[in-house]
Amino acid sequence: FNITEIVPDIHRAIRFIRYNAAKYGVRPGKLGITGGSAGGHLSLTMAVKGEPGKADAKDPVDRESSAIQCVACFFPPTDFLNYGQPGEDAVGVGTLKDFKVAFGPRAETAEERQKLGREISPIYFVSSNTPPILIAHGDADKLVPIYQAEQFMKRCQEFGVENKLVVREGQKHGWADMVKDEEIFADWFDQYLRGLPAK
């Protein structure tokens, strides 16, 4: 599956959870999402592209919203058109050439890469409605440069979106004590989903 095929499945999963909120004992208006790397990218995609329910849908699950209310993620790609620096194309080429299949057939030409890269890069869809976002990122990450997180957070600030960047000095694409960051994630979710005081 490529990115454009996966995203609808994430919309569906969130709608399914919201539809079954009572069954699962969750508050449907307080859903958070997390992930790392590609999963972090999908988490941010849902933060900026969550959709309202389709009132006229035959399937009741599709009548639910796919919007989420909070994100905490690790080292996510946020802008495939400006990857490690302005103008660096990584839509299945360059740094991400080994992941070309994830971008599908539209990654074959420079023209299509520009279109696709914009469509799938969360940074272009940040708005004042974007929920709170926390990103943990290693500053020695070569696969997903920290530039990705830094630029995304700048965009969040431009729109007044609550955001926090946790920089792990000297760390690459993952590190040994990530469980400590998961605790920070839990505190972030507690603050923005449960209304508990910030730690």
Predicted regions and their residues:
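Primarily recognizes the serine-hydrolase "nucleophile elbow" in alpha/beta-hydrolase
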Residues: 12-88
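Loop/turn elements at helix/coil->beta-strand transitions in domains of secreted/extracellular proteins
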Residues: 28-30, 66-70, 130-133, 159-164
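Short beta-strand/loop motif that positions the catalytic acidic residue
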Residues: 129, 134-137, 141
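Conserved alpha/beta-hydrolase "acid-adjacent" motif
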Residues: 142-151
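Histidine-bearing beta->alpha loop at or near hydrolase active sites
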Residues: 168-175
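Catalytic active-site module of serine/aspartate enzymes centered on a nucleophile-bearing elbow/loop
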Residues: 180-199
